[in-house]
C-alpha cells in the first residue's frame, strides 16, 4: 500500500486489496503502475513476477522490476526474441564504432609522424622549401656574370677593330703632290677590316700629315660611344681628317 492509503498499481490492476508489505507497492506507483504491471502480467504472470521479486535482495528489486517491465514490452513487439534482438543490434553498433575508432587512431598517428619528420615522408621537402631569396640571388649572380662576359667580349672585339683601323690607315694612306707646288693636296682611301671604304680628303701646305693626334681622339670617342650603346663603330666615329 502506498503512503496515501490508495492501492498500488499492481493491486489496482489485479483488483485486489493492497496489504501492508505488498511486494509490488514500492515499484509500481498508483499513476503508471497499472499500465506497467499489465504488460508484466500478460507476459510473465503476476505470481511469477511476485516470486522473482521476493527471492531478490531489497537493494536489487527496483532494478529487477524495471528489467521485467522492459522485457515484457519487448516480448509484446517480438514474442520470439524479445529484447535479445535489441541487444544484438546494440552490440553490432559497438563493434562498428570500435572499428571506426581504431581507423581514426591510425590516421592521427600517421599525421603526427608526418609533422614530426617531414623529410621521411617527402624526401624533397628541404629541396622544395629552399629559401626563395637564395634562388633569386643565384639567378642575379648568373645574370651579372653573363652580362660581364658579353661586355668583355664586345670590348675585346672593339679593341681589335680599332687597332686594325689604326695600322691600316697608317699603311694605306699615302700623300701625293698636287699641282700647286709646295702646296700638298692629298686624297686618301681607307679600307676597314669589314670591307667598307671611306675617302679621306685633306689639304696641307707643308706636306706633313697630322693624323696621329686626331686619329687617337677619334678612336677614343668611338670606344666611349661603343661602351654607352653605340652600334656604328667606323661610319659614325671616323670622319674626314685634315692635315697641314
Curated annotation (Swiss-Prot):
Expressed in roots, stems, leaves and flowers. Signal peptide: none annotated. InterPro entries: LOB (IPR004883). Induction: By auxin. Residues 6-108 form the LOB domain. One of its GO terms (biological process) is callus formation. PROSITE patterns: LOB. Belongs to the LOB domain-containing protein family. This is LOB domain-containing protein 17. It comes from Arabidopsis thaliana.
